[in-house]
UniProtKB/Swiss-Prot annotation:
Native source organism of the sequence: Ajellomyces capsulatus (strain NAm1 / WU24)
Region (Disordered): 25-122, 251-287
Keyword flag Mitochondrion: yes
Membrane topology classification: Single-pass membrane protein
Pro residues bias spans: 108-118
The protein's name: MICOS complex subunit MIC60
Chain ranges on the Mitochondrial matrix side, renumbered to this chain: 20-126
Compartments it resides in: Mitochondrion inner membrane
Function of the molecule: Component of the MICOS complex, a large protein complex of the mitochondrial inner membrane that plays crucial roles in the maintenance of crista junctions, inner membrane architecture, and formation of contact sites to the outer membrane. Plays a role in keeping cristae membranes connected to the inner boundary membrane. Also promotes protein import via the mitochondrial intermembrane space assembly (MIA) pathway.
Coiled-coil region list: 337-482
Amino acid sequence: MAMYLKSQAVLTLIPQRYHALARKSNAGRRCSLTPNSATASQFFQKAASSTSTKPPGPSDADVRSPASPSSRSSLRPESIPKPPQSPPVQGQTSPGSEVLPPDHESSTPPPPPPPPQGPKSSRLRKLLYLFLTAGLAYAGGVWYSLRSDNFYDFFTEYIPYGEEAVLYLEERDFRNRFPHVTKQINRRVTVPKDEGAQVTIPSGSGLSWKVAEEQQEATDMTKKGRRMGTAHANEPTKDIKVAEKAKEEVKSKSAAKKEDVAANIPIQEDLEPQPAKAEERNLDAPRQPAVPAATTIERLVQDKVDEPVVQDLVKVFNDVISVISADESASKFAGPIAKAKEELQRIGDRIVALKKDAQESAQEEIRNAHAAFDKSAAELIRRIDEVRTQDAAEFREEFESEREKIARSYQEKVNTELQRAHEVAEQRLRNELVEQAIELNRKFLSDVKTLVENEREGRLSKLAELTANVAELERLTAGWSDVVDINLKTQQLQVAVDAVRTTLENSDVPRPFVRELAAVKELASNDEVVAAAIASISPAAYQRGIPSAAQLVERFRRVASEVRKASLLPENAGITSHAASLVLSKVMLKKQGLPTGDDVESILTRTENFLEEGNFDEAAREMNSLQGWAKLLSKDWLADVRQVLEVKQALEIIETEARLRCLQVE
């Protein structure tokens, strides 16, 4: 900052210095300072480069403005040494004017300091980051609302302007996906109505005051229906105001509809006019008026035509008839009106025929389009079915080949294991037979020795008894073969059961035991009890495996923590209830021992104690007594425990059956 102030002071003193030197050297002469020297230009370039760093603005309170050289600057013009005067240059127009070179010592200022960092920039940066983060979060919420229905409900209900933003994006997406819909809507442009030429009504048409005073009141066809008799037309006028009112209405209607009449009534030259029907006269009238009554013209009725254009044309024509009927010279227009009626009737019939033809052609095109679409759809379905059938055949062949490979590999493994087990059992049986033969020989020798000694003592008195013993030994030796076969099968069954139990107990992860179970089933093929026990095991259990006891306990601890979090939730819980239950579950104290009660914490404590004791049956019963969210969360764990219990029960039944066989042999 000090260097910057010093450079500003030097730049301020430069013009004053030159001005003071010029005044002292050329007193009373005209001073013309022109910055044409190379030294002056270099000085100004260095000064400008030294001050290229933007100084702090006047709004910064910590930075003061540089002081003027006349008041606060420490550098005075008098303290600057004067350079020697340069010799006069030839050809100079003003002998007294000169340009002094700047001082080179002060032209090299030190490097400018770094600009100070104000606190406002950091605040603006934080505010900008906050706005960007909020905008990104809002945009992300709008995008995720289009993907998730649950988040859509939350976002549109609790976020301001969330519903409008989501609806706007959905509308934009709809317009991008179906652009032809908006184009068809924009194509519906209202066609301007051709008003046609103006129609001039004669000045003598309409009602007059003489008709209201002398003649009977004319019938208002727009209010009385489509057809009226002459008896209503001959009724006397009761009030002059009624005629004046009718005259004003007729004039207003004629002025409003005169342009529509000229535009909507088509001119057909090929139609011949037909004479109008003469109206029936009422012969029972009490008297004849002095002035003939106004002729009433029958209005046109088009009930069969539903076209809006024809109905509007008929309405305009009926208004014209009403205007003519209200005039005293209505009889003059009876013929043209009748001709116009016939032409309008023909026009309506022609429009109906054209509409019917257009509808029939449109229906024919629709039927043709439907037939073509059905044909193309059937062809497409046929192609899809062919491709699907081909793919299914290829997939079936691949599946059969893979299944055969897998079955072959598993069969080889099973045969290898069975062969090894059979060899081990046979070797064990041979060893036992050798031991039993040795024992029998030893007993036989001891018996023979005893008999020989007894014979020696009894002098052949017990020879018959010795013969009986030998026969008994032969019988026992012959019966031992059956015992050996039964023992062999029992031992093989026990080995297979031990293999299943070892597989279940020594596996760190659930492993399938299909091969071991198949070996047990093959060894006990004639035993119905073993077959029923194997059938009671779920196929998913021996195909995927079952967890061990340690895995069940570890998983129960994780499930128990989640059940404690949801223990305080009602049936129809929301976000607030979930949050409250999560917070309160952290505060709840765990029970110890065997607590009594049906609350979630007591049930979890008892279940954990039963699991530590190895009593999975009671643990499953305790967890099955849970209700609501707790039971829903522990559903998968209960299914695993049930599979473990089913497998253990089946293995216990098979082991019991094997022991029973041994007892039967004994």
